[in-house]
Amino acid sequence: SIKNFYLTHKFISNLIDNYRSEKINKIISFNTKKKLNNLRILHITNFNERLDGRLFFNTGRRINNGFIRLGHSVLGFSDRDIQKYYKSFQDFKGAKTLNDKLKKTCYNYKPDIIILGHADLISPEQIDELKNDYPNVKIGQWFLDPLNKKGPDFERNKDRILNKINSVDATFLTTSPSALNFMPKDKCFYIPNPSDKSFETLNNFHKSCNVDVFFALSHGVHRGVLKYGKTDDRVNFVNKLIRLTPNAKFDVYGINNIQPIWADHYFKTIENAKMGLNLSRGDAIKYYSSDRIAQLFGNGLLTFLDEKTYLNDLFSNDEAVFYKDIQDLSEKILK
């Protein structure tokens, strides 16, 4: 009857809209329901293309290699390089182009997982938009910088890691989450600095090396050279250690106006060292280390670790040397 007639223009229009939305969502999520051994992973981090290979062994490339060895497809998205290359008068910071390029990349690649590493240029709002467009995608972030209150750039690093914490499904830190009272414990996990057999190839334990102890620092991997007037507590520590241990032969860089070393020069230098000092900026905190730990262990240098890092939970006394203080370290170097 006319009274019970329901096939109005509005009803049919809503029906078409719902059908269209259902089909579009299926198209968007197509290719995201896969077996775990064949995933598409979009890895957003700084691959340092503009540095001409100086950081060819950086953590982002190590993680890429690990995913590929596990049988996954990996697409690298170098956010800082893209932002730098696409700056213009119309897009002064390059942010608009970066976000547009990310959306187009996701549309074409249809990732199962999006991984962000120090991707500060990607906003939480952009991540939320991608999650809305691709509801089946899982998103995680990794973070390598120190997060202890007495360490360098604490407030800045804290803000960086918390910036997207509510937009990602998981966060991976090189500091134990149990040592950080500001991090939600339910979706934060410890990740060690990765070593890679294609980068760490030296096997120094099989060689007769001329240098006893190697140590290198820098004033920032992107800067490359020492910054005038910058102070670093590790300089005082290492200089004191050298004075306390006159019978050991040290090879140090980034200290006393000796410039940092990079790329192939770095590996050629540590190839001649028996032992390596794993010394990170700031006070020791549970499990934290800079990525030098992977380079020292991975290349077969006997590595010294501050026992206040609690890394003896992960390494035995047969795998590393743990020291209590600088005097203890000096004595153990000479043993």
Task: Set out the residue ranges of the language-model regions.
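C-terminal "capping" alpha-helix adjacent to the active site of nucleotide-linked donor transferases
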Residues: 325-335
